[in-house]
């Protein structure tokens, strides 16, 4: 089951810009890709919180999480099975590598 579906079935409204924008923007055209990224940040600004699933964070996700950090947007962390990740145990969580730990540092993480 997709993360968007799980989120929707949990009663929240998922905004998945990386699935929506490629339906009318070409990711291979740099200007259109940057337009999509900028619009994604605008959508994020309208959201109440951001969900992060899994420990593999792409460069695009990192860019979005940096924006969430700058704007103090609340973030929820989940593993790939939709289990909440406890921010207090991340230093000893073997699933979280140093890059992940660095990216989520100073995020406004919700429990």
Positions of the model-derived regions?
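Conserved catalytic or regulatory cores that recognize and/or transform ribose-phosphate-containing ligands
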Residues: 1-111
């Amino acid at each position: 089951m997709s993360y968007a579906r799980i989120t929707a079935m949990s009663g929240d409204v998922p905004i998945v810009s990386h699935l929506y924008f490629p339906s009318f923007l070409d990711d291979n055209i740099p200007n259109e890709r940057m337009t999509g990224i900028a619009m994604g940040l605008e959508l994020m600004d309208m959201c109440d919180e951001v969900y992060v699933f899994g420990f593999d964070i792409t460069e695009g996700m990192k860019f979005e999480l940096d924006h969430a950090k700058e704007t103090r947007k609340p973030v929820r962390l989940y593993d790939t099975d939709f289990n909440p990740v406890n921010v207090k145990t991340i230093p000893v969580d073997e699933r979280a590598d140093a890059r992940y730990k660095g990216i989520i540092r100073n995020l406004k993480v919700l429990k």
